[in-house]
Each structure stands twice: as C-alpha cells, then as structure tokens.
Curated annotation (Swiss-Prot):
Disulfide bonds join 23-93. The keyword Disulfide bond applies. This is Ig kappa chain V-II region MOPC 167. Residues 62-93 are annotated as: Framework-3. PANTHER family: IMMUNOGLOBULIN LIGHT CHAIN. SUPFAM superfamilies: Immunoglobulin. Residues 55-61 are annotated as: Complementarity-determining-2. The keyword Disulfide bond applies. The lineage of its organism: Eukaryota, Metazoa, Chordata, Craniata, Vertebrata. GO terms for cellular component: immunoglobulin complex. Keywords: Adaptive immunity, Disulfide bond, Immunity, Immunoglobulin. Residues 40-54 are annotated as: Framework-2. Gene3D superfamilies: Immunoglobulins (2.60.40.10). Residues 24-39 are annotated as: Complementarity-determining-1.
Length: 112
C-alpha cells in the first residue's frame, strides 16, 4: 500500500497569517496520463470532510482562492493564505493512484 505521511504544525496559527501543510507519499502520484492524483480535504469540527483540492492543484467548486495546492510526484503542499477562523480543523491528503486509496493521518490547524 502507498503510505501517506503528514507532519503536525509546530504552533497554532495567528489569524491573517499564511500556513503551509505538507504531505509525502511513499510512491510517485504522477500517473501515466500526466495527472497527479492527490486530493486535499478539510474536516471542520463536527462536520464531514470537505474536498478542497483535487489532482494536486485544482480547487473544488466554491473553495476560496486562499487555498492552493502544489507539489511534484511524492512531495506536496497545501498553502492557506490569510487564515480565518473558518479554516480551523484537520487537513487530510489522499492518494488515488492505486488501490487501496490511502489517507494521511491528518494535520490539525488551530488558531492562537
């Protein structure tokens, strides 16, 4: 199985700051069609996970442009600019390049 690793944030974030959340895969997620099969989700407290970004960098419908995804093959970053209270929750990355589809353990974002 592909192992997805996410790091914890070292400190709570101040509202208005930017933050980067990292994700690493044990195998390249660049498929033969040229697309990178990595999703980002946000699970807000008490809610179901919401898809933020698919194919590494494509924002889902209705998702703020404060969220951006980037990366290459095995190393990925979710950048959140001008953090707001509504961004608090657990961020998960997911690989879709092979079954079983696997998630990282999540990165919790908290505000100061």
């Amino acid at each position: 199985d592909i192992v997805i690793t996410q790091d914890e944030l070292s400190n709570p974030v101040t509202s208005g700051e930017s933050v980067s959340i990292s994700c690493r895969s044990s195998k390249s997620l660049l498929y033969k069609d040229g697309k990178t099969y990595l999703n980002w989700f946000l699970q807000r407290p008490g809610q179901s996970p919401q898809l933020l970004i698919s194919l590494m960098s494509t924002r889902a419908s209705g998702v703020s442009d404060r969220f951006s995804g980037s990366g290459s093959r095995t190393d990925f970053t979710l950048e959140i600019s001008r953090v707001k209270a509504e961004d608090v929750g657990v961020y998960y990355c997911q690989q879709l390049v092979e079954y079983p589809l696997t998630f990282g353990a999540g990165t919790k974002l908290e505000l100061k």
